[in-house]
From Swiss-Prot:
The organism's taxonomic lineage, starting at the top: Bacteria, Pseudomonadati, Pseudomonadota, Alphaproteobacteria, Rickettsiales
Coarse class of the protein's main subcellular location: cytoplasm
GO biological process: cell division; protein folding; protein transport
One protein family per Pfam: Trigger_N
Domain of life of the source: Bacteria
UniProt similarity note: Belongs to the FKBP-type PPIase family. Tig subfamily.
Known function: Involved in protein export. Acts as a chaperone by maintaining the newly synthesized protein in an open conformation. Functions as a peptidyl-prolyl cis-trans isomerase.
Signal peptide extent: none
Domain PPIase FKBP-type, chain residue ranges per copy: 182-267
Subcellular location: Cytoplasm
UniProt remark on domains: Consists of 3 domains; the N-terminus binds the ribosome, the middle domain has PPIase activity, while the C-terminus has intrinsic chaperone activity on its own.
Keyword entries, A-Z: Cell cycle, Cell division, Chaperone, Cytoplasm, Isomerase, Rotamase
The protein's name in its UniProt record: Trigger factor
Gene Ontology cellular component annotations, sorted alphabetically: cytoplasm
Amino acid sequence: MLSNYVVKEILNDNKLKREYEFTIDNKYFFSQLDAKLLEIAKNVKIPGFRAGKASIDLIKKEYLNNAVNTLIRKIVEDTSSEFIKNGKFGEIISSNVSIISCPDYGMDVSSTSGDPVGDNLVYKLSFEVMPEAPLIALDDIVLSDIEADIQDSDISEFIENLKKQCSEFVEVSDSEYRVKIGDKVIVDYQNRIKGKMLKGGDTKDLAVIVGRGLVLKDFEDQLIGMKIGESKSFPIQFPDNYGVAYLVGKSADVSVTVKNIFMMKAVEENENVIKYYQFKDEQALKDFARNKIKQQFDKISFAIVKKELFDYLDKTYSIDVPECVVTQEINKINQEIQDSAGTVQVDVKAEAMKRVKLGILLVKMSRHHNISINKDDVFSFINTYYSDYGINLNDVLRMLQSNKDFANYISGKVLEDKVINYIIRLVKKDKKVMTTQELNLMLENM
């Protein structure tokens, strides 16, 4: 097909962007169009004619526009694919085609395709190529090797937190006791707007743990200081993010009666924790605490060493990064900032370029050293990074199967961590022993 089109280079910035203008030979175009129309004529059924017996003029009248548009798509696909294959451009990240002009075959092609009419089929092909990345020189890298200094105070603090988790609510018998944050309160309440009871607004025996944020904050705040048997009325306003659309922004009058109060009774002795969690003895409890602290320590130290490595790679290596990938990363970072309610402060473009550059370096490393991931790697990653947040692992696994974007995201993260661990294993180490407090302080200052 090379003899049927001419290619002119219109952009080569000596980096990653390429643009070429393709002009398709008219004789070739029209011969292909005639062949397409004959193919249609042989197979199409037109009322009043037997299959294949309709005149070519009738076929043109009915099917010319469709035939031209189909042919243009095929020629563009065939010529651009052939050119890219023969051009040996390497890995192409994104491409775009724009039609400059189309042949005039006695009809207004622009009326159906939106493309201008001209003497030849001319189109522009634009694309970006993946840059050639250097291989990371492992001999030049020195990273921290952080060893945990877990102290008795760390274990005691961990066990104290376990005690809070196995605490229980006990009924308050003092009639003068007033509701405090953390108490569980049993209430009856009614909601009215302009005197009219809301649907579902008359509720009995609602249990509210004050301070948990499971009901409106204005409602919780009004419960603080109330006694058993006390009733009160107060206004509330439904917030903009309230789950019931027709109530958003509206004010309501609430009447509430406290029927019972339960206060949290903390577990005081280790024996209670041992019994609650079914540990063999106190030493088993302490071993469990030490192991959990070590796991958290290792996660934090990995994050710190990972940042050390990324900072080194960013400073040491310079790569031209594809603009289209940077744009995608900018969108991701902006979404992260939005999700964090503005608590993340970062130079978005610089961070996006850094992430793309590091990704290219790590992909080069994975390919050179044949590093790949399997199902066990994915499951281990999910278990490590999701189990601490109370997320059901089966839900995550189902999402992996049903959501392609999520699956690609997880696969990318798993490969990234596997390459990083490979690098950490082979580079020089600077041994450091740190307490959990020192490690957490370092994490805060990252």
